[in-house]
């Protein structure tokens, strides 16, 4: 039995040496002496500090020189489509209101339903075309101003809105141009003020402190 045990130990050590596991290793005392100053305990599955795996901000894979925010050209598609859908929905509701008002003296019948449906379709198409045209002009002016100035800020928004109103009302003469420009200037200024309200509020609070 003793001879068998010795032969078994020899075969085990031979296999261990063959697979490279028979070399000298580090004891627990040696590993305990390795300093980990300023580091959290390492994960048993990762050979890195887990603190460096936490990302506070979103990361994007972008080409060299690309921006993380969408430009005027990318937002133009969303703006035009959203305005068309909003105009169609508002026009449909307005057409339904007008249709019910104009046919209130008629009994519920097929002619009345057809007349209401025609009013809904007409008003929906009218408002969708109007808002879509305004969005197209606004987006085109915004892209042109952005490419010309080489910057994207609230000044582009206000300028694009003013020029859109002036061009849309250019058929009404100088008075129509002035009214359209004033309307565009007012709406875009309110929009820019709304977008910067949080930043302005924070700045005022810091100044008051």
Curated annotation (Swiss-Prot):
Subcellular location: Mitochondrion inner membrane
Phenotype on disruption: Mutants are not viable. Heterozygous animals show an aneurological phenotype, premature aging and reduced lifespan.
Transmembrane residue ranges: 73-93, 125-145, 181-197
GO molecular function per UniProt: protein transmembrane transporter activity
Membrane topology: Multi-pass membrane protein
Keywords, in A-Z order: Membrane, Mitochondrion, Mitochondrion inner membrane, Protein transport, Translocation, Transmembrane, Transmembrane helix, Transport
GO cellular component: migrasome; mitochondrial inner membrane; mitochondrial intermembrane space; mitochondrion; TIM23 mitochondrial import inner membrane translocase complex
Record-linked InterPro entries: Tim23, Tim23-like
One GO BP: type 2 mitophagy
Function: Essential component of the TIM23 complex, a complex that mediates the translocation of transit peptide-containing proteins across the mitochondrial inner membrane. Has a role in the activation of stress-induced mitophagy by protecting PINK1 from OMA1-mediated degradation and facilitating its accumulation at the outer mitochondrial membrane in response to depolarization.
Family statement drawn from the similarity comment of this UniProt entry: Belongs to the Tim17/Tim22/Tim23 family.
Assembly: Component of the TIM23 complex at least composed of TIMM23, TIMM17 (TIMM17A or TIMM17B) and TIMM50; within this complex, directly interacts with TIMM50. The complex interacts with the TIMM44 component of the PAM complex and with DNAJC15. Upon mitochondrial depolarization, interacts with PINK1; the interaction is required for PINK1 accumulation at the outer mitochondrial membrane, kinase activation by autophosphorylation and PRKN recruitement to mitochondria.
NCBIfam families membership: 3a0801s02tim23
Protein name: Mitochondrial import inner membrane translocase subunit Tim23
Species of provenance: Mus musculus (Mouse)
Organism classification: Eukaryota, Metazoa, Chordata, Craniata, Vertebrata
Gene label: Timm23
């Amino acid at each position: 039995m003793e001879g068998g045990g010795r032969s078994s130990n020899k075969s085990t050590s031979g296999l261990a040496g063959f697979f490279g596991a028979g070399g000298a290793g580090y004891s627990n005392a040696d590993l305990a002496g390795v300093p980990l100053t300023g580091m959290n305990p390492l994960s048993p599955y990762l050979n890195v500090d887990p603190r460096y795996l936490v990302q506070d901000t979103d990361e994007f894979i972008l080409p060299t020189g690309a921006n993380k925010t969408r430009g005027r050209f990318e937002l133009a598609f969303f703006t035009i489509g959203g305005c068309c859908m909003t105009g169609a929905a508002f026009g449909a509701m307005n057409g339904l209101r007008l249709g019910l008002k104009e046919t209130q003296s008629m009994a519920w019948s097929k002619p009345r339903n057809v007349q209401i449906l025609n009013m809904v379709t007409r008003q929906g198409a009218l408002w969708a075309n109007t808002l879509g045209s305004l969005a197209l002009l606004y987006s085109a002016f915004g892209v042109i101003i952005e490419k010309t100035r080489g910057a994207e800020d609230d000044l582009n928004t206000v300028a694009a809105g003013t020029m859109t109103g002036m061009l849309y009302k250019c058929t009404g003469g100088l008075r129509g141009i002035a009214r359209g420009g004033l309307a565009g200037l007012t709406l875009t200024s309110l929009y820019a003020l709304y977008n910067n309200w949080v930043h302005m509020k924070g700045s005022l609070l810091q100044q008051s402190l």
